[in-house]
């Protein structure tokens, strides 16, 4: 009560100062504006929050092409201002967020609206909020909650020449990634006003940089998997060239374990990749408790009943979906035949274009979809084919089951590998002699192949063998006479599509890099073709 009385005393003092100002100055004070940001896809645009306080029937009106959650700020802002110790005169308040042709959504406009109202009423000097972007959601008690999309907003502020950003404390680690912008964290409306008036902020958050990592590295290793040496080599090749791969095998053969360990052999992300991934997760509101720069490559494994908008992105106010959240990492579809046909067929275009375009309310949103697709499935409905002692599925049943994945989608997998059931002797042999490929040795082989690709594609806009165009293949996948005869014979015998032919050559190029070969050999082509046995690998 004492604290509230002091606050009200300050209010009355401010009111008296306000009333003593000449009428011309008072008219100026009744209008104020501050800067904020709105998300548009993965980017942000700077917007201006304008407030006019005038005579008339007391009301609070808002305009500027606003979503429902922005309109709901009326009551949040009014109550938060009162509970922070500030009193507003019973006048007509009009809020406009411009430009009006951009849809405004999210709760990050609460704080800028409140500060603009306080500025218009003389509680703060508008000059002090010049060159500052303001973001934050208000609670009824005046505290400030975190919001999504702070990173792209601060990045856009930097591009626009804005030097300061007033953001929630919980978004501090995220905001400070951007250099040359003074990040001001605040946890209450009162603290924000204190900073604007006095340039002082209390309890500025200074987290340990190690806490900024938003994903927890699990101690998983390919050494945990006994046997499956062929599948491990195929996985290593797939990661080296960012090739899409499918695991087919009975339940318990290690398909899921194999896939979940892929991040352990992927090279660490560059800073630019980390920034791109962090930007995506910021927009999606999935940066976690500490926020900050995402250090680990994404591994997304959506359940098979995922909705179309959650998978591809979209909704009334578009947000990134699973295929975008998996960017620079792995999208793992376990039990792939259980996914809805519209999900599987919808993958075809993003796999080719590496992005997805969504149209909502007359605007076009383009999200990246630069991921490595990893699938896992059983060879038949019961899962035990070709073990006829346990499998009673007919060949027609098997074909029908495999047919849940269309041939155009099959064609987009560079590699397919069987994971056979592991017997007791294999488990004991592997555990006794310790001669099991582990993640560290596999990662070193991947790094050597990646280095070869880095030199090969230096100065080009591609990084991996899987990204080569037809022209790039003619340049980097030249074949000798024997190799040409072999690929020609395979093409004719198996009636390959043009895409299938290019997939074999790209995979062969990666195998050559893994083995340290300058040129593609017949052995490389034969191995690449072995991985393209789709779907014959399951029924022969």
Task: Give the predicted meaning of each segment.
Residues 1-15, 137:
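Single conserved hydrophobic/aromatic residue that forms the stacking wall/gate
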Residues 16-246, 253-256, 500-501, 518-540:
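Peripheral, non-AAA+ core regions of ATP-driven protein-machinery
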Residues 66-74, 89, 96-106, 318, ...:
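Basic, amphipathic alpha-helical bundle interface domains used for macromolecular binding and assembly
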Residues 247-286:
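Walker A/P-loop
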Residues 249, 313, 335:
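The Walker A (P-loop) glycine that initiates the GxxxxGKT/S ATP-binding motif of P-loop NTPases
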Residues 302-323:
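Short glycine-rich substrate-engagement loop in P-loop NTPases that contacts/grips substrate
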Residues 328, 334-335:
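Walker B catalytic acidic pair
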């Amino acid at each position: 009560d004492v604290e509230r009385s002091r606050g009200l005393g300050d209010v009355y003092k401010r009111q008296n100062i306000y009333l003593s100002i000449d009428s011309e100055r008072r008219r100026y004070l009744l209008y104020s504006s501050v800067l904020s940001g709105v998300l548009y896809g993965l980017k942000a645009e700077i917007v201006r929050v304008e407030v006019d306080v005038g005579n008339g029937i007391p009301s609070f009106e808002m305009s500027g092409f606003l979503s429902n959650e922005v309109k709901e700020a009326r009551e949040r802002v009014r109550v938060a201002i009162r509970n922070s110790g500030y009193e507003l005169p019973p006048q007509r308040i009009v809020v406009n967020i411009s430009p009006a042709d951009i849809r405004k959504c999210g709760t990050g406009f609460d704080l800028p609206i409140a500060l603009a109202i306080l500025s218009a009423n003389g509680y703060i000097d508008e000059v002090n909020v010049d060159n500052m972007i303001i973001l934050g959601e208000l609670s009824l008690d005046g505290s400030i909650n975190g919001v999504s999309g702070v990173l792209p907003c601060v990045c856009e502020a930097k591009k626009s020449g804005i030097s300061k950003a007033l953001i929630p404390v919980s978004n501090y680690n995220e905001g400070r990634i951007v250099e040359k912008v003074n990040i001001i964290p605040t946890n209450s409306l009162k603290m924000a006003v204190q900073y604007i008036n006095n340039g002082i902020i209390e309890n500025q958050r200074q987290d340990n940089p190690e806490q900024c990592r938003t994903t927890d590295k699990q101690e998983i290793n390919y050494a945990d998997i006994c046997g499956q040496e062929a599948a491990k080599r195929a996985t290593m090749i797939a990661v080296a060239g960012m090739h899409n791969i499918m695991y087919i095998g009975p339940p318990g053969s290690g398909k899921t374990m194999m896939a979940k360990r892929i991040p352990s052999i992927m090279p660490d992300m560059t800073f630019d990749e980390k920034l791109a991934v962090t930007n995506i997760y910021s927009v999606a509101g999935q940066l976690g408790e500490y926020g900050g720069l995402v250090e680990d490559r994404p591994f997304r494994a959506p359940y098979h009943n995922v909705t179309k908008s959650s998978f591809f992105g979209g909704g009334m106010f578009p947000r990134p979906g699973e295929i975008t959240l998996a960017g620079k990492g792995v999208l793992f579809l376990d039990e792939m035949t259980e996914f809805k046909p519209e999900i599987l067929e919808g993958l075809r275009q993003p796999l080719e274009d590496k992005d997805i375009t969504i149209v909502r309310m007359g605007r076009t949103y383009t999200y990246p979809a630069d991921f490595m697709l990893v699938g896992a499935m059983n060879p038949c409905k019961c899962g035990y084919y070709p073990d006829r002692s346990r499998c009673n599925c007919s060949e027609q049943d098997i074909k029908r089951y495999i047919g849940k994945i269309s041939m155009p989608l099959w064609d987009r997998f560079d590699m397919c590998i069987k994971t056979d059931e592991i017997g007791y002797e294999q488990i004991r042999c592997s555990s006794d002699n310790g001669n099991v490929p582990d993640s560290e040795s596999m990662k070193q082989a991947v790094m050597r192949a990646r280095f070869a690709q880095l030199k090969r594609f230096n100065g080009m806009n591609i990084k991996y063998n899987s990204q080569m165009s037809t022209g790039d293949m003619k340049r980097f996948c030249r074949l000798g006479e024997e190799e040409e005869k072999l690929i020609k014979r395979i093409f004719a015998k198996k009636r390959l599509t043009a895409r299938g032919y290019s997939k074999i050559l790209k995979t062969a190029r990666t195998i050559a890099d893994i083995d340290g070969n300058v040129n593609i050999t017949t052995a490389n082509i034969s191995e690449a073709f072995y991985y393209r046995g789709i779907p014959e690998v399951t029924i022969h």
